[in-house]
Amino acid sequence: MHPPSPLNTQQKDWLTRGGSLTAHLRLLGQVQVQVQREHKAMAWLDEYRVLGLSRCLLVWVREVVLVVDAKPYVYARSLTPLTASYNAWQAVRSIGSRPLADLLFRDRSVLRSALASRRITAQHPLHRRACNFVAQSHATQALLARRSVFTRQGAPLLITECMLPALWATLEPVAAPRQASLSADGPCRHSAQIVSPESMLE
């Protein structure tokens, strides 16, 4: 098996950008949030580990595709303990097709963990979900994803964002300046402590 190719500058940049991913995507075109799933369920094993939750605990899950100019750029999955979806994170249940950034980056009580990122392969359930929006020629390739935990009133909200091939294809001919992208975050105080883009999603 060949070792994975190193990340290029664009990939490292997008995997480690703080602030709102939706705001960064808006620099590339018109963003639409397409909701795929909203329901209570069991979390995946790696998600239980990240949040330190018992494996029998139900969570509230929301999965969306972030589409830019009719192209799927990001498959995103968020979850919080089911009890928190009725309390600290109850707004997640009613946000509909608005981006979660509308909640996360306007509430100064919300804290954010460091970003962690990795390549995910076909063995991971997130890869299988995301590949519904990937051309067949890319379906077996590893995808790049990042995640962080937002905390409000002591309750966690885990958000995982899987970058799709259409995003990288758009960025190849257009090297957007870093400074321009950061200006889209506005006066948000949720600057994350960044970890290596090769670090594991727990």
UniProtKB/Swiss-Prot annotation:
Compartments reported by the entry: Cytoplasm
Keyword entries, A-Z: Cytoplasm, Lyase, Pyruvate, Ubiquinone biosynthesis
Annotated region described as Disordered, given as residue ranges: 181-202
Involved pathway(s): Cofactor biosynthesis; ubiquinone biosynthesis
GO cellular component, one term: cytosol
Top-level EC class as recorded in UniProt: lyase
Catalysed reactions, as listed in the record: chorismate = 4-hydroxybenzoate + pyruvate
Record EC number: 4.1.3.40
Entry's Gene Ontology BP terms: pyruvate biosynthetic process; ubiquinone biosynthetic process
Annotated positions binding substrate: R62, L100, E161
MF terms in GO: chorismate lyase activity
Function summary: Removes the pyruvyl group from chorismate, with concomitant aromatization of the ring, to provide 4-hydroxybenzoate (4HB) for the ubiquinone pathway.
Family per record: Belongs to the UbiC family.
Protein name: Probable chorismate pyruvate-lyase
Taxonomic lineage from the root: Bacteria, Pseudomonadati, Pseudomonadota, Gammaproteobacteria, Lysobacterales
